[in-house]
A protein has these predicted regions:
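Short hydrophobic beta-strand element within catalytic cores of glycosyltransferases
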Residues: 241-245
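Conserved acidic donor-binding segment of nucleotide-sugar-dependent glycosyltransferases
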Residues: 256-257, 261-269, 278-284
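Membrane-proximal helix-turn-helix segments that form the acceptor-binding/catalytic region
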Residues: 44, 92-109
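Aromatic "clamp/platform" in nucleotide-sugar-dependent glycosyltransferases that forms part
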Residues: 224
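Short His-centered aromatic/hydrophobic patch
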Residues: 55-60, 80
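Donor nucleotide-sugar binding/catalytic pocket of nucleotide-sugar-dependent glycosyltransferases
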Residues: 107-141
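Conserved donor-binding/catalytic core segment of Leloir-type glycosyltransferases
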Residues: 144-162, 168-171
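Short alpha-helical donor nucleotide-sugar binding micro-motif in glycosyltransferases
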Residues: 205-206, 212-216
Length: 321
């Protein structure tokens, strides 16, 4: 029986559920620079060795690589669910070379979406790469959203690659033309928005999302890049119709489900505004059909199915490294 360590930064609820299927040994490496450095220094004196280290995200690589240097037989599997490889070309030379050096120690990848898998494949086509979609952990299948409302929703943190700022600009375009839309921003994204409008509701972090799922009609996520935000699955569970870019992980699912009309060609504010109107102006029968299909899609990606798939993929990958 192989000894497996899961190193994490929290972890994300879904990633934790995945990890539980393969190990009970967990180690928190930290979610901020001071904590990561402190734990890295402490790990220098840690003599424990493991056959496999499953790493949640790129920030955990220094700790895992240090263990591999001390115990070269250790295998590292990266649960790739962040923007590390997307950000790589934009890094300064020193940082990029450091990250590339850390990445070279990885033996295999489990990406959180085909989008992330494609990015990994561009850099590491000679290493085993699999993908397993996450799932919504705050689903609301009992709710039927108000498909006729002009209330729009975005949920996310303050990472600017999510481009909630462009969504604000898009809704301003619509309201300047006489349309009466409200935009609800939930999460730390609000810290990056300095403008104020009567129609812009900066909600911040919220424990209960149901009140937004009940009265909104569209969930808009116009990211430059977002691996596979579970908020898309969660919004769809209440029947909200998503509008996303091709660079959001769920875009492959929408394309495969015949819902390519919900994918933005680009995330320019004018294009976002046009897509909101296009979907919002559809007849009730069409919106009901799409809303129900969104619920069905969301229900397919759940804890049981995805955790089992992760376990299967993990051990399949182990056989290859």
């Amino acid at each position: 029986m192989k000894s497996i360590l899961f190193t994490h930064q929290g972890p994300h609820k879904v990633h934790g559920a995945f990890a539980r299927t393969v190990t009970k040994n967990w180690y928190r490496y930290g979610d901020n620079q001071p904590e990561i450095i402190k734990n890295l220094i402490k790990s220098v004196f840690d003599r424990k060795s493991y056959d496999v280290i499953l790493v949640e995200g790129g920030l955990g690589l220094p700790h895992a690589v240090l263990k591999k240097i001390k115990h070269p037989e250790t295998k590292i599997i990266l649960l790739y669910a962040d923007t590390l490889l997307y950000d790589l070309p934009k890094m300064n030379l020193l940082k990029r070379k450091t990250v590339e050096r850390l990445l070279s120690y990885i033996d295999g990848f489990i990406a959180i979406s085909p989008l992330n898998k494609r990015i990994v494949s561009q850099h590491y086509h000679n290493k085993p790469i699999y993908h397993v979609y996450p799932y919504g952990s705050n689903n609301s299948f009992e709710i039927d959203c108000d498909l006729e409302s002009h209330d729009l929703l975005f949920i996310g943190n303050h990472e600017m690659c999510k481009r909630f700022d462009l969504l604000v600009d898009a809704v301003k375009i619509l309201n300047d033309r006489g349309y009466e839309y409200n935009l609800y921003l939930v999460g730390s994204c609000v810290s990056k928005i300095d403008v104020d409008y009567p129609w812009l509701h900066k909600e911040g972090f919220q424990e209960d999302l149901n009140k937004y799922f009940k009265h909104c009609s569209l969930y808009v996520h116009p990211a430059d890049f977002d691996s596979c935000p579970v908020t898309v699955f969660e919004a769809m569970s209440s029947g909200l119709i998503p509008i996303i870019t091709n660079n959001v992980g769920e875009s492959d699912i929408l394309n495969e489900s015949g819902l390519e009309c919900l994918i933005l060609k680009n995330n320019e504010p004018e294009m976002i505004a046009e897509k909101i109107l296009q979907i919002g102006n559809q007849n009730k029968k069409w919106k009901n059909y799409v809303s129900l299909k969104c619920k069905e899609i969301s229900s397919k990606y759940n804890n049981e199915t995805q955790s089992k798939l992760f376990k299967d993929v993990f051990y399949k990958l182990l056989d290859e490294i």
